[in-house]
Amino acid sequence: MCIFPKFYTYNTADPEYYAFEGNEKDGFDFTRFNPVFWENLERRIRQLDELGIEADVILLHPYDRWGFSKMDRDTDVFYLKYAVSRLCHFKNVWWALANEFDLLPWKSVEDWELYARVVMCRDPYGHLRSIHNCVELYDQTRPWITHVSIQRIDVYKTAEAVSEWRELYQKPIVVDECAYEGNINFGWGNITGEEMTRRFWEGCIRGGYLSHGEVYVQHEQIWWAHGGRLHGTCPDRIAFLKDIMADVPEGCAPLKLTPENHEANWDVPCLCKESDHSYYLYYFGFFRPAFRTYELPKGCAYEIELIDTWDMAIQKLPGIHSGNIKIGMPEKQYMAIRMKKI
């Protein structure tokens, strides 16, 4: 959630309140905060907490016509000290130092590093911290960055890159903006619900996290800009995935390919618990095999389920399975296989 208002296509209205005293016509007093705005913001964060939702508070962003993105360094620091001090007591707050920091080229790396120190100094509770990109990535190895908040920078490769990013940065990966379900003219906002769901599954099985968004233009309000009702087809499927992930045992991680397991596992991601061979979750994405063969770990027996991630259906296969097995599959996209040791 942004503290400063956003000016962009489909989102051009003035907000009811501003963080600083003043208005667009008469100008803003960058030495005086508007208490009505901040009280309303606190109420909204509290409401999110009541719904079990984390608030990733975006402190700075470039989509601006009021002058907030062009404040000088001293004013930025003054604002950040106040914002973080006022909001850090909420347990559901995260700090996004910027949305698309690279679209603010007048702010230097030295500026961002200073702002990060201000945030840490003013937040005794150590909430999560990130800095989000448009095209150019910030140095995500910086120690103040707790997790990588990353926008996909390739038209086609999105959640598939989670494996590479996890290995590169050794931090949790949050794919913020893997694209949006919708039908607008921009390439980032017109993928199908099926593709959005696939990206969520792909990213989660690879050990990452993803954010959802929706931009359908035929409705009075565009959810991405204004909130309101969701009209897309993927939210229920994402909720289904959330239930699947909640059932994943502690200690699971993406399967690491080795010369021994490469041939059987190179083509689909797998989330598993290799320490005791107790759990395997394979996701096939847009592949649609008629069958799949596995050589199960010696001495282990499994219950096996076919999961239709789009129809949100789980089919338990009859019997107990061990050794070399062949699993019949429906030649359908977006399937998964789950194996649980008994």
Question: Could you tell me what each predicted segment is?
Answer:
Residues 1-158:
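Active-site mouth of glycoside hydrolases
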Residues 55, 173, 304:
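Hydrophobic anchor at the start of a short beta-strand
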Residues 72-76, 108-109, 126-129, 151-154, ...:
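A short linear-motif detector with a strong N-terminal bias
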Residues 80, 94, 145, 170-171, ...:
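Generic secretory/membrane-interface signal
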Residues 87, 165-166, 296:
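Alpha-helix C-terminal capping segments
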Residues 92, 99-236:
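Extracellular glycoside hydrolase catalytic/binding regions
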Residues 181-184, 196-318, 328-342:
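Aromatic- and carboxylate-lined catalytic core of secreted/periplasmic carbohydrate-active enzymes
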Residues 323-325:
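Short strand-edge motifs at loop-to-beta-strand transitions and within beta-strands
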